[in-house]
């Protein structure tokens, strides 16, 4: 039965995610305290890689895409394209703080309670070489924790503004043009 298979895969993913988070939580603080600790960097980066792959495979897209954004950033640190700093540590910490809730939401077949877009955008900005501040990371975290509802409110506000603009332009668009005599 497909339902039983789906449940089994879901349970395996949740167990694996918990194990991966344990490893990340072991190695990330070591690296955060000493950026020269390449072995720890590689270990916790592998955790993001695993979450990306297994999340995508089982349909935990939000977890997979968030993990991919951070794995990409960590790949650049590993390859010495990006120099780590305390802002990056803060950003990774914020990411790690939301993953367990996202996994829990997936396990319970609930929509994600976290809007991961601001955290992914911050990681992408770092990958592009943008300089983020601690305040930028705090804002991204605040927006993430505001949840998908805040994103929906912003979308609704933008749609309402567009509708109002379109309505104000409609009379201009439909007015008969004066033909020269």
Regions inferred by a protein language model and the residue ranges of each:
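Non-catalytic helical tethers at domain boundaries
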Residues: 1-181
């Amino acid at each position: 039965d497909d339902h039983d298979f789906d449940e089994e895969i879901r349970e395996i993913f949740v167990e694996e995610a918990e194990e991966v988070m344990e490893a990340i939580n072991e190695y990330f603080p070591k690296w955060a305290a000493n950026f020269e600790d390449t072995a720890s960097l590689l270990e916790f980066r592998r955790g993001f890689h695993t979450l990306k792959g297994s999340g995508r495979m089982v349909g935990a897209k939000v977890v997979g895409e968030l993990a991919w954004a951070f794995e990409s950033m960590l790949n650049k640190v590993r390859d010495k394209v990006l120099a780590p700093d305390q802002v990056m540590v803060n950003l990774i910490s914020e990411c790690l703080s939301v993953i367990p809730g996202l996994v829990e939401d997936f396990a319970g077949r609930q929509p994600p309670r976290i809007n991961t877009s601001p955290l992914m955008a911050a990681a992408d900005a770092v990958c592009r070489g943008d300089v983020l501040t601690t305040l930028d990371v705090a804002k991204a975290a605040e927006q993430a924790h505001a949840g998908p509802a805040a994103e929906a409110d912003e979308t609704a506000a933008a749609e309402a503004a567009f509708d109002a603009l379109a309505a104000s332009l409609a009379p201009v668009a439909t007015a008969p043009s004066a033909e020269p005599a």
